C-alpha cells in the first residue's frame, strides 16, 4: 500500500491574524505519533526479536537436515523468506519513528518495503508446494516412494521463489521517493501517476493470487487430506500435517487486514474520509502482516512435545524433531504396504 495522496493541502486554518509560535510546526501537525503507529512500532520490535532469532535457529537446524529429509527443505525455505523480511524491520521502524520520513534513498525505498510482499508470495507459494506434497503422500504414496526426492523438492522451491520475485515486480517498479515541504520530509510510497485502473489491477492481482486463490485451493486440499486421514483412523505422521495446517491458517489470519485495506484503498478516492482513515492504519496493517514472519518458529516449538518434554529437550533438538521427516516416510511406506496388501487380496480372490 503506502500510496501517495495527491490532494491539495488545506491551508484554510491560516489567516492574517495568526501569530507565529516557534514551538509549533508551521503546518500545525503534531510531533506525537498516532496510536496505530505506536502499536506498529511495538509489533515491529517484537517481530524483529522473535523473527530473527527464531528463523535463524530454524535455518540452522534444517540446513543440516535438508540433505536427507524433504520436510527440512520446505521449512528451510519458509524460514529464509521470513528471515529476509525481518531484516528490513529496523529501517521501517526508523521511518515510522520519524513520522514516515525516508532518509535511506530511492533504491532502499524500492527494495526494503517490497520484501514483505516477496515474503507473502514466497510463503504462500511454498505453502502451496508443501500442501501438494502432503496431498501426494496421502493419495499417491507409491508415486512418492518412487519419485519424491530432494532434487525435485529443490526445483519446486526454486520455481516458487522465481514466481514470487515475478509477482513482486510491480512493487519494485512503482515505489518512489517524494519530497514534501509542509512539513519538510521525504516519503517512500507507491506512485501510479494518477492511474487508478493500474492501481486497482495491481491490488486485485495481489488479492487474488496472494490470498483468495490460495485460500480456496488449500482449503479444498486439506479437506480431502483430513477426510482421508480420519477415514483411515491414522495416528502416524499427524504431527507434520498439524504443523502445516497451523502455518497455513496463521498466514491467512495475519495477512487478512493488509489485503482488505489494500483493495479498499485502491477503489477509494484519496480525499475520502475512509481512505484517509485507512491510510492512518496502514502501518498497523503492515505490522500485523509481519507477525506471520515470526509465528512459524513458535508453532514449531508448540507442536514439539508436551510441556515436560519441552523442558527436558534443548530447543534445537525439539525443532529437529518437528521439522524432520521420519514419520512422513513411515506414513508413505504404511500406505504403500496397505495398498500392496489390498492388491494381493484382490488377486487371491480372483
Curated annotation (Swiss-Prot):
Which residue ranges are recorded for the region named Required for CHIPS binding? Answer: 10-18
Residue list for modification Phosphoserine: 314, 317, 327, 332, 334, 338
Q: Which residues are recorded as modified (Sulfotyrosine)?
A: 11, 14
- The positions making up the signal sequence are none
Query: Transmembrane region positions?
Result: 38-64, 70-93, 111-132, 154-174, 201-226, 243-265, 283-303
Q: So what does mutating residue 144 to S actually do?
A: Fails to homodimerize
Ranges per topology, Extracellular: 1-37, 94-110, 175-200, 266-282
What changing residue 157 to S does, per the record, is: No effect on homodimer formation
Q: Which Pfam families match?
A: 7tm_1
InterPro entries referenced in this protein's UniProt entry, alphabetically: Anphylx_rcpt_C3a/C5a1-2, Formyl_rcpt-rel, GPCR_Rhodpsn, GPCR_Rhodpsn_7TM
Membrane side Cytoplasmic: residue ranges: 65-69, 133-153, 227-242, 304-350
Any one GO BP annotation for this protein? positive regulation of angiogenesis
Q: What is the effect of changing residue 14 to F?
A: Weakly impairs CHIPS binding. Strongly impairs CHIPS binding. Loss of CHIPS binding
- UniProt cross-references to PANTHER family, sorted A to Z: C5A ANAPHYLATOXIN CHEMOTACTIC RECEPTOR 1, CHEMOTACTIC RECEPTOR
Q: Describe the subunit structure.
A: Homodimer. May also form higher-order oligomers. Interacts (when phosphorylated) with ARRB1 and ARRB2; the interaction is associated with internalization of C5aR. Interacts (via N-terminal domain) with S.aureus chemotaxis inhibitory protein (CHIPS); the interaction blocks the receptor and may thus inhibit the immune response.
| Function as written in the Swiss-Prot or TrEMBL entry | Receptor for the chemotactic and inflammatory peptide anaphylatoxin C5a. The ligand interacts with at least two sites on the receptor: a high-affinity site on the extracellular N-terminus, and a second site in the transmembrane region which activates downstream signaling events. Receptor activation stimulates chemotaxis, granule enzyme release, intracellular calcium release and superoxide anion production.
- The protein's name in its UniProt record: C5a anaphylatoxin chemotactic receptor 1
The source organism is Homo sapiens
- Gene coding for it: C5AR1
Amino acid at each position: 500500500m503506502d500510496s501517495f495522496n495527491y490532494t491539495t493541502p488545506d491551508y484554510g486554518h491560516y489567516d492574517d491574524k495568526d501569530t507565529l509560535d516557534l514551538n509549533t510546526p508551521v503546518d500545525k501537525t503534531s510531533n506525537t505519533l498516532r496510536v496505530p503507529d505506536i502499536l506498529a512500532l511495538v509489533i515491529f520490535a517484537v517481530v524483529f526479536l522473535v523473527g530473527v532469532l527464531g528463523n535463524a535457529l530454524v535455518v540452522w537446524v534444517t540446513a543440516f537436515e535438508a540433505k536427507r529429509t524433504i520436510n527440512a527443505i520446505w521449512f528451510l525455505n519458509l524460514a529464509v523468506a521470513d528471515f529476509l523480511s525481518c531484516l528490513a524491520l529496523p529501517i521501517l521502524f526508523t521511518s515510522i519513528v520519524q513520522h514516515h520520513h525516508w532518509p535511506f534513498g530511492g533504491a532502499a525505498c524500492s527494495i526494503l518495503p517490497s520484501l514483505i510482499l516477496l515474503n507473502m508470495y514466497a510463503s504462500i507459494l511454498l505453502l502451496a508446494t508443501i500442501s501438494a506434497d502432503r496431498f501426494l503422500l496421502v493419495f499417491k504414496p507409491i508415486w512418492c516412494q518412487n519419485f519424491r526426492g530432494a532434487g525435485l523438492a529443490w526445483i519446486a522451491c526454486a520455481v516458487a521463489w522465481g514466481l514470487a520475485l515475478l509477482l513482486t515486480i510491480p512493487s519494485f517498479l512503482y515505489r518512489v521517493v517524494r519530497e514534501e515541504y509542509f512539513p519538510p520530509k521525504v516519503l517512500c510510497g507507491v506512485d501510479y501517476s494518477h492511474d487508478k485502473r493500474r492501481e486497482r489491477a495491481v491490488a486485485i492481482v495481489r488479492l487474488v493470487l496472494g490470498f483468495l486463490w490460495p485460500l480456496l485451493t488449500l482449503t479444498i486440499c486439506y479437506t480431502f487430506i483430513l477426510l482421508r486421514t480420519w477415514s483411515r483412523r491414522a495416528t502416524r505422521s499427524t504431527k507434520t500435517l498439524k504443523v502445516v495446517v497451523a502455518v497455513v491458517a496463521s498466514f491467512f489470519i495475519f495477512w487478512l487486514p493488509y489485503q482488505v485495506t489494500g483493495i479498499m484503498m485502491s477503489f477509494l478516492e484519496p480525499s475520502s474520509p475512509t481512505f484517509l482513515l485507512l491510510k492512518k492504519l496502514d502501518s498497523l496493517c503492515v505490522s500485523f502482516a509481519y507477525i506471520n514472519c515470526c509465528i512459524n518458529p513458535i508453532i514449531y516449538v508448540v507442536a514439539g512435545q508436551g510441556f515436560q518434554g519441552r523442558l527436558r529437550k534443548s530447543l534445537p533438538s525439539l525443532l529437529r524433531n518437528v521439522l524432520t521427516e521420519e514419520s512422513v516416510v513411515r506414513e508413505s511406506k504404511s500406505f504403500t504396504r496397505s495398498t500392496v496388501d489390498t492388491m494381493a487380496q484382490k488377486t487371491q480372490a480372483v
